[in-house]
């Protein structure tokens, strides 16, 4: 019995001993709470705090609510005494600390520590303890009451209610700054903890199994020798090759994109090779073309291919039906005045005018003339044969090219071996002639020829023939160190036929010689006052102009043409359009081969080579030769007058300009008539 009693006693003692040990090892609830709070305060510093947001903006309140929840806080939708902090964006929230009702607002952390450390927390949940009331006089109480009435915070507002309940008021800027600071601290803690964990994983990474696989060739793989980084790879369809022809900034492994021509050739070669394999028959590759789908309003159905639909029976029956025969009959009666389609009309080729860029001819063109000569054109009619010579001064005319026939002028200049020879106009008896002939063909061709000078005599012939001047001859034409003064005077006389009427009437009374502007081109043709051009009416409708020089021409005149060292000057031919105005001449009983004593003198002016602009050409045409020139009116075209003569007086300029403009193409130049 004793033994059993001993067992029971020991068992009871053992149990009691275990209970004592358990009581010693079991921690109290208060100690558990105090141990867990510091850990939570590190990770979530706003744990156990209740907030109320007094913010008008929904987005700001949602963002702030999310940050508070991340830090362990809680947001309530209704304001009550259980709320720890009120967050507002009003100005009064900043000045709540300066008010006499409450003490300065502590931070949430300090408020939390105050709650935990205070042994006797207040009943309203706030750590604020009202100071002991001091007995004040009646006057001071009235003053404080007046101050309270004029307080910044209005009564019956959220802030005033929070102050009355003892809720801490925080401005939104303060809570934002506090949240940012806590986020930085948490980020540093997490970073340090992850680094420690990564170190532990690296130690045990060798034991972990990794997924392995085989790469298909060809591939490129890059591995790290230290095995700190995992390898990366790239699988390719074809092994790349280096392109040496590519430029420097580009990668040498970039493949040049084949052009469309190369693709076509590759397709053709492939077709040929396939054809050779199958007994020489070419196999056409079926290329998939996108079919144009649409809707036919005539057949009221959709189609996938237009051509197949047009060839279908349903569409052909609709097109060939007689339902619209009435409309076709009405349309056929209408007048066809439609414009031809561009594809149907043949394209007209544009006429190309060859305007060559002539090389400049280096020359000192003219001598410095000491005197400015004026040449007068005398208008002679049959009534004025016995009167004195009348002159018409300084008139410039521009005649339009209305005739279809082309009149071309040829200026042929040949080298003169002797530099001391002088160009002189002599009489017909002395075999020096200057003749103008007009053939009875469709085109009246005028050519001016300068022949080489003889030792004693010089010849100047105006021959009518058709020649052309090439651009190569113009480029070779260079006049170096020559000074040329072409002198001549053209006299125009009118001859009529006998009363027999065997000779037909001439259609021409006036000959307009093409010329270039002396001012621009500096090419002066000065005719002497005594030589003349004689216009003769012949039975073969030839217009012959002969230049005669009187016997009393002095051998040495100041106006002479000196040609020096002109071996390099080839014969030049220029086409010019000349307008000839032909009038009706009455048959009068005058002797043939009769010559009027009165002769008209005029000067031929050179034509502008290329008109740069229509405005400039007009200005050049209507520009007078002298500053003080006067316009004396147009000459009258009477039936009795044989020839209409106009005076053009040009001023000679002392210049050393180029001679290129003298040989210009006729397609672009306009003729300035007399």
Curated annotation (Swiss-Prot):
Localization (cell): Nucleus
Phosphoserine: residues carrying this PTM: 312, 354, 359, 381, 413, 508, 625, 667, 669
Ranges of biased composition (kind: Polar residues): 113-130
Keywords of this entry: Cell cycle, DNA replication, Metal-binding, Nucleus, Phosphoprotein, Repeat, Zinc, Zinc-finger
Cystines in this chain: none
Pfam families attached to this UniProt entry: zf-DBF
Single GO term (MF): protein serine/threonine kinase activator activity
Designated name of the protein: Protein DBF4 homolog A
Species, as recorded: Homo sapiens (Human)
Gene designation: DBF4
């Amino acid at each position: 019995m004793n033994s059993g009693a001993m067992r029971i006693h020991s068992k009871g003692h053992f149990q009691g001993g275990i209970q004592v040990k358990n009581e010693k090892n079991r921690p109290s609830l208060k100690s558990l709470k105090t141990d867990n709070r510091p850990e939570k305060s590190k990770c979530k510093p706003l744990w156990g705090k209740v907030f109320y947001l007094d913010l008008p903006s929904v987005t700001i309140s949602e963002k702030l609510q999310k940050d508070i929840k991340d830090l362990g806080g809680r947001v309530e939708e209704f304001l009550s005494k259980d709320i720890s902090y009120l967050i507002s964006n009003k100005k009064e929230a900043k000045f709540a600390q300066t008010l006499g009702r409450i003490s300065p607002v502590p931070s949430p952390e300090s408020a939390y520590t105050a709650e935990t450390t205070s042994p006797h927390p207040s009943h309203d949940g706030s750590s604020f303890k009202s100071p002991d009331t001091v007995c004040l006089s009646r006057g001071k109480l009235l003053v404080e009451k007046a101050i309270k009435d004029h307080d910044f915070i209005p009564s019956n507002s959220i802030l005033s209610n929070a102050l009355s309940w003892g809720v801490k008021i925080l401005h939104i800027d303060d809570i934002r700054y506090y949240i940012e600071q806590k986020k930085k601290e948490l980020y540093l803690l997490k970073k340090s903890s992850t680094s420690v964990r990564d170190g532990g994983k690296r130690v045990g990474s060798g034991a972990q199994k990794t997924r392995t696989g085989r790469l298909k060739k060809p591939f490129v793989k890059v591995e790290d020798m230290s095995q700190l980084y995992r390898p990366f790879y790239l699988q390719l369809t074809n092994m790349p090759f280096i392109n040496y022809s590519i430029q420097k900034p580009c990668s040498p492994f970039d493949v040049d994109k084949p052009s469309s021509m190369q693709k076509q050739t590759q397709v053709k070669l492939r077709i040929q090779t396939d054809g050779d394999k199958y007994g020489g028959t070419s196999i056409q590759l079926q290329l998939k073309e996108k079919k144009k789908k649409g809707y036919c309003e005539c057949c009221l159905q959709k189609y996938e291919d237009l051509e197949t639909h047009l060839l279908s029976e349903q569409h052909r029956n609709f097109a060939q039906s007689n339902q619209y025969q009435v409309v076709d009959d009405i349309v056929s009666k209408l007048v066809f005045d439609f414009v031809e389609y561009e594809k149907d009309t043949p394209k007209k080729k544009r006429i190309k005018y060859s305007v060559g860029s002539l090389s400049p001819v280096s020359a000192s063109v003219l001598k410095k003339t000491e005197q400015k000569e004026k040449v007068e054109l005398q208008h002679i009619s049959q009534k004025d044969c016995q009167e004195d010579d009348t002159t018409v001064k300084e008139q410039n005319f521009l005649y339009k090219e209305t005739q279809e026939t082309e009149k071309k002028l040829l200026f042929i200049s040949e080298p003169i071996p002797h530099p001391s020879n002088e160009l002189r106009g002599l009489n017909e008896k002395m075999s020096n002639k200057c003749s103008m002939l007009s053939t009875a063909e469709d085109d009246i061709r005028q050519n001016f020829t300068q022949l080489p000078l003889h030792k004693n005599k010089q010849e100047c012939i105006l021959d009518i023939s058709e020649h052309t001047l090439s651009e190569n001859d113009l480029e070779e034409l260079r006049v170096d160190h020559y000074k040329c003064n072409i002198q001549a005077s053209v006299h125009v006389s009118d001859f009529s036929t006998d009363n027999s009427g065997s000779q037909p009437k001439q259609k021409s009374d006036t000959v307009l010689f093409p010329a270039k502007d002396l001012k621009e081109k500096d090419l002066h043709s000065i005719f002497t006052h005594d030589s003349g051009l004689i216009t003769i009416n012949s039975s073969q409708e030839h217009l012959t102009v002969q230049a005669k020089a009187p016997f009393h021409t002095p051998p040495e005149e100041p106006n002479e043409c000196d040609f020096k060292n002109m071996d390099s000057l080839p014969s030049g031919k220029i086409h010019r359009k000349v307008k000839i105005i032909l009038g009706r001449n009455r048959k009068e009983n005058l002797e043939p081969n009769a010559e009027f004593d009165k002769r008209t003198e005029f000067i031929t002016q050179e034509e502008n080579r290329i008109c740069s602009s229509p405005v400039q050409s007009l200005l050049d045409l209507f520009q007078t030769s002298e500053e003080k020139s006067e316009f004396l009116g147009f000459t009258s075209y009477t039936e009795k007058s044989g020839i209409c003569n106009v005076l053009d007086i040009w001023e000679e300029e002392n210049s050393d300009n180029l001679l290129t403009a003298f040989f210009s193409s006729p397609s672009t130049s306009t003729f300035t008539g007399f």
